[in-house]
C-alpha cells in the first residue's frame, strides 16, 4: 500500500517537512516514490503539487492524519470530488 506521508528535513530544532508518496513498509526517512509537496510549520508555508497529489489519491494512496489535515486546509479534497463526478 502507498501513503502520503511527511518526511523530516532541516536542521536541529528547525524542522521542515516534505510531503512524499512512499510505500507503507518504508521507514520515515526511507526512499520515496515521489515528492509532492513541502510544509514548513514554523513559517506556516505550504507548497503542494496538486495534480500529482490528485493522481495518487485517485490510484488509492492513503494520506496520514497530519497530511490529511494539510490537504483539507488547502482544499485538495474538493478538487478530488469535482474530478470524480461524472457528467452524463
From Swiss-Prot:
Signal peptide extent:
none
* Places the protein is found: Plastid, Chloroplast
TM segment ranges: none
Q: For this UniProt entry, what's an example GO CC term?
A: mitochondrion
Gene Ontology molecular function terms on file:
structural constituent of ribosome
* Family classification: Belongs to the bacterial ribosomal protein bS16 family.
Q: In which organism is this protein found? A: Gossypium barbadense
- Gene coding for it: rps16
Keyword terms of this UniProt record: Chloroplast, Plastid, Ribonucleoprotein, Ribosomal protein
Matching entries from InterPro entries are given as:
Ribosomal_bS16, Ribosomal_bS16_CS, Ribosomal_bS16_dom_sf
Name of this chain's protein: Small ribosomal subunit protein bS16c
Ribosomal protein in keyword set: yes
Instruction: List this protein's GO terms for biological process.
Output: mitochondrial translation
Amino acid at each position: 500500500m502507498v501513503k502520503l506521508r511527511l518526511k523530516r528535513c532541516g536542521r536541529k530544532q528547525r524542522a521542515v517537512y516534505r510531503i512524499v508518496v512512499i510505500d507503507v513498509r518504508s521507514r520515515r526517512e526511507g526512499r520515496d516514490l515521489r515528492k509532492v509537496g513541502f510544509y514548513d510549520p514554523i513559517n506556516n508555508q505550504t507548497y503542494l503539487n496538486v495534480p500529482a497529489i490528485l493522481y495518487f489519491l485517485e490510484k488509492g494512496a492513503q494520506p496520514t492524519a497530519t497530511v490529511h489535515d494539510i490537504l483539507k486546509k488547502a482544499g485538495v479534497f474538493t478538487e478530488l470530488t469535482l474530478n470524480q463526478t461524472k457528467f452524463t
